[in-house]
Amino acid sequence: VAGIYQRLRQELIVGGGEPSESPDPSTKSTAIVSGLVILGLLVWLGFENAWTLLFVVGLLLSVFLHEIGHFATARWTGMKVTQFYMGFGPRLWSRSRGELEYGVRALPLGAFVRIVGMNVLDEVEPGDEARAYRNKSYPRQFLVITAGSLMHFILALAIFTGVYSSAGRWAETGRVEVAFTSAPGSPAEALGLQVGDFVTAIGADRVSSRDELVEAITSRAPGDRVDVSFERDGVSTTKSVVLAANPREPDVAYLGIASWSKDYVRESPLSSLGWAVRDSVSSVGNSVKGVVTALNPMNSIRALQNPNENPETRPTTVVGASQIGGQLGESEGLKGVLLLLASVNVFVGVFNLFPLLPFDGGHAAIATYERLRSRNGTRYRADVNKMIPVTTVVLGLLAFLLFAGLYLDITNPL
């Protein structure tokens, strides 16, 4: 227990990382076996569903860029960075360059950058005090600790912009297309409407969206005669027909078609950027609600009892997200995978700013608290030891959510 406590204290409160000395042979063997297992799983995943593999690679790249954000801003602000690793657990491969040790660890569950002097618990060599995180100004601390989430937001913005300007944005096209017609005897059959026709007007009401078409029809009564204008192969036609009663709602008028008016619409680069900003901001709002939902353990408990009751509130892990990515790839292609990846980046960026350790938001909250408590040139130092019990509870909650999510993703995929 004492060993676990010390590891928690060192790696999660002080800032991650492990001793740099060479691992013993058993640890090295474990690392090699773990790495081979992970490599085998990735190869299998590539054969099983290439889109899922692409999504997983995108997630790993996102994690790498997250740490690049911390690393680059720490170096830029004069902090000392001693480690940069992809993955956790036993080391698979590492190199040293100057004061920096970098490499890959066996478990691809994230990454970390080790910055000296994250708080008063971190022992710092006397010669490194000037370069310690804790001795830098508050703006520099805040920049470094939030740079990871900032990278997620920038990546999401870039993906949204790229997809909108190349493949298009899911939006109103300005045309209402007939998707299919109903059973024989409907007004649509009397008009001769076919799949692929475009409805342009109901009476005097011009329609350019599905909602406008529904409004134009339901604002009339069954038995009303109306002129319906539609276009086929570039030729416009207008015919008169009597609206029927909706089989499910006899008081509502009924034409007898299903329609859609949305599709992927390519935008100019400038317009794409504008829409990317709007959609990123909207995703931030949705992600805040999602974080609150995800961190509520009652949602996980209810999901374990009844997985299909409310899929929107059940915990989802990388496994579930990757499954969704594979499904989107098969139905929507590359754009579907990329748009999901952008949304996930926004969520991770928001989630990581949760103001408790071990999240980056916890370090940002501590830096802000210290800044507010500092007076007359005297720097206040928060006692991070007091946060360890809270951090332990948070880690316990995260572990529960992780295992609950994994169980649901494997036994009852979305």
Task: Please name every model-derived segment.
Residues 28-45, 402:
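Hydrophobic core of alpha-helical transmembrane segments in multi-pass integral membrane proteins
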Residues 40, 387-409:
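Final/C-terminal transmembrane alpha-helix of multipass membrane proteins
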Residues 194, 200-201, 214-258:
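PDZ-domain C-terminal substructure recognizer with occasional recognition of PDZ-binding tails
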Residues 179, 188-211, 280:
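Conserved PDZ fold ligand-binding element
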Residues 76, 109-177, 389-393:
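Internal alpha-helical transmembrane segments
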Residues 5-30, 131-132, 136, 246-348, ...:
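Functional transmembrane alpha-helices
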Residues 46-56, 159-175, 410-413:
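Aromatic-capped interface at the extracytoplasmic side
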Residues 2-18, 50-127, 351-375:
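Small-residue-rich helix-interface/hinge motifs
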